[in-house]
Amino acid sequence: MAYHWQVISRLLIALLRVYKLVISPLLGPRCRFAPSCSDYAMTAIGRFGPLRGSWLAARRLGRCHPFHPGGFDPVPDAPTSPSPSSSCSCKGPHP
C-alpha cells in the first residue's frame, strides 16, 4: 500500500513542477512567503506524504493573500519517534 502513496506523491510533485515551469513564469512573482507556496507544497508532500502534505499546502495557500504579512514560513519538521519519557504524561520517575 505504501507504494501507492509514493506514486501519488510523485505525481503531485510532478504537477507542481509543471506549474512552476509553465504557469508561474506567466503570472510573475506573487507569493508573500519564503519558500514560495509551490516549493512549500513540494517539500510538505515529500516529507509528510500526499494527504498531510496537501493539507499543509492548502493551509499555506489560504494564508497567501494581500492581507497577510507573509515572511519566512518553513515546512514543519517531520515527527520523530517519541522516546518513552517524552510521551508519558505522568509526573513520577521512569524506570
UniProtKB/Swiss-Prot annotation:
InterPro entries named in the record: Membr_insert_effic_factor_YidD
Superkingdom: Bacteria
Annotated keywords: Cell inner membrane, Cell membrane, Membrane
Membrane topology, from the record: Peripheral membrane protein
GO cellular component terms attached to this protein's record: plasma membrane
Positions in coiled-coil regions: none
Subcellular location: Cell inner membrane
SMART domains linked to this entry: Haemolytic
Residue ranges with Low complexity bias: 83-95
Region feature (Disordered): 72-95
Principal location listed in the UniProt entry: membrane
Keyword RNA-binding found: no
Family: Belongs to the UPF0161 family.
Role played: Could be involved in insertion of integral membrane proteins into the membrane.
Protein name: Putative membrane protein insertion efficiency factor
